[in-house]
Amino acid sequence: MKYTLEIQKLLLQAQNKNLHPREKANLLKEAIRIADENEDVEWATEMRLDLIYELNLLSADTEEIAVFSKILDDYENHKDVIKEDDLLWKYKWIWSSTFDIPEIPMEQVEAVGEDYKTRILRNGYSLRSYYQRWSVECTWMRQYDKAKEYIDKMLAEKMDDQSCEACELNFMLDYYLETGKFDEAYSRAQPLINKQVTCYEANLRAYLKLAYYAQKAGKPDIAADMCTRAEEALAGREKDEYLLLYMGLFIAYYLMTNPERGWEYAERCIDWSLRTNTLKKYRFSCDMVEALKYEMRPEVHLALPE
């Protein structure tokens, strides 16, 4: 079948590691279009799941949700070729994305969460990932008592294939760091620091925020160690714009210790902030307000996008 060769050619191009996620997304969209034209629902679904990964790197939440809605529609109409279980990991991402879009009312966010909950239960999973997501949201909203309740509920559930131990631990650090429990956070972070548990971004995110909070806690040696680890992990990830959410406090750390390096990162991140979603733009702005407290010079000169 000629169309399969066309798709394979596009997918081969998308494997180029030098491509920006936006370029990969465009190649996947074209491949999906061809699959749809030829009514290859199974292959189109696989590629849409891959597309969601690339869109996630671009913080393209609204588009992610639209793509996943199509996947769910196809699942309902083609349960003979699409397994619901194969969709649930990305569904967790999509539910997370709904929290980040102010235009989506909380009632709808909760409804998506309940639907996700129903689907994971009927596929034999625990509620661990469901409670974990709520713990993250409550921490971000500074509802720390509720966050701790959800953390406790999460830990009481069994670990399964909908869970990521490294990501869970990374997000738990936010609760302990933001409530002033640095020593406990640092102790709990050891599996991430020593790479006993790993994930694509969880270890790096831990280094970034621990550098800032260690410096604030009067522990410069720990802060310097976390900074070194972060710099090593950031090498080669200059295109990972989704890291914006975690870079602001790292910039703040550098403005306390090495302002020139901090502003180098700021130049990169300000460019990213012009293309990201509303939540990340807001949180980066808040972190930069914090960072500016440590810049003593009345004026700095930056190379910014036009």
What kind of feature is each model-predicted range?
Residues 32-40, 72-81, 114-125, 152-163, ...:
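Solenoid-like repeat scaffolds
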Residues 118-128, 132-133, 142-187, 196:
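Alpha-solenoid helical repeat scaffolds
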Residues 54-55, 137, 175, 213, ...:
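TPR/TPR-like alpha-solenoid repeats
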Residues 8-16, 30-33, 42-60, 86-99, ...:
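Non-membrane alpha-helical segments in proteins
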Residues 17-30, 58-74, 100-115, 138-153, ...:
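Helix-turn-helix repeat elements of alpha-solenoid scaffolds
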Residues 273-306:
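C-terminal non-catalytic interaction modules
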Residues 1-11, 24, 44-46, 87-92, ...:
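Generic helix N-cap/helix-start motif at coil->alpha-helix transitions
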Residues 1, 6, 10-18, 300-306:
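Long C-terminal extensions of eukaryotic subunits of large macromolecular complexes
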